């Protein structure tokens, strides 16, 4: 029986696993960060409702993490087309490592943003001078996810380089 598939038949599994890992882990980080910092905003809003809109920054920053995972998942999934060109294990592993790099970086950044955001908005309600410090810490936590996104893009661009075509 003839097949139009070219390459290693198990390789797309690893590629799609990388796309799923990028999205799932990044969204887990985004969900945790949103929930944890959202609880802080809600509890702070009871005493100081005028600060709610100012304190929504950690929630927004946590939500962006899911977008990073979506970007990598789309890049990976568009690179998996075994019928158009050969797709080997090297390509699958490159896409898997790309998804894991972005996803796990997003998960860790989401945990950091959630914890810092929760404590930061509560502290900001008591001492408004802490707002700038909280934002700086949140930016450094968000940078962790950006590192994962950059490494994920670099790793996914390596797919297809194992052969001379």
Curated annotation (Swiss-Prot):
Keywords: Hydrogen ion transport, Ion transport, Membrane, Transmembrane, Transmembrane helix, Transport, Vacuole. GO terms for molecular function: proton-transporting ATPase activity, rotational mechanism. InterPro entries: ATPase_proteolipid_c-like_dom (IPR002379), ATPase_proteolipid_csu (IPR000245), ATPase_proteolipid_su_C_euk (IPR011555), F/V-ATP_Csub_sf (IPR035921). Disulfide bonds: none annotated. It is found in: Vacuole membrane. It comes from the Eukaryota. Residues 1-10, 77-95, 156-165 are lumenal. The record marks 142 as: Essential for proton translocation. The chain crosses the membrane at residues 11-33, 56-76, 96-117, 130-155. It is a multi-pass membrane protein. One of its GO terms (cellular component) is membrane. Its main location: membrane. Pfam families: ATP-synt_C. Residues 34-55, 118-129 are cytoplasmic. Proton-conducting pore forming subunit of the membrane integral V0 complex of vacuolar ATPase. V-ATPase is responsible for acidifying a variety of intracellular compartments in eukaryotic cells. V-ATPase is a heteromultimeric enzyme composed of a peripheral catalytic V1 complex (main components: subunits A, B, C, D, E, and F) attached to an integral membrane V0 proton pore complex (main component: the proteolipid protein; which is present as a hexamer that forms the proton-conducting pore). NCBIfam families: V_ATP_synt_C. Belongs to the V-ATPase proteolipid subunit family. This is V-type proton ATPase 16 kDa proteolipid subunit.
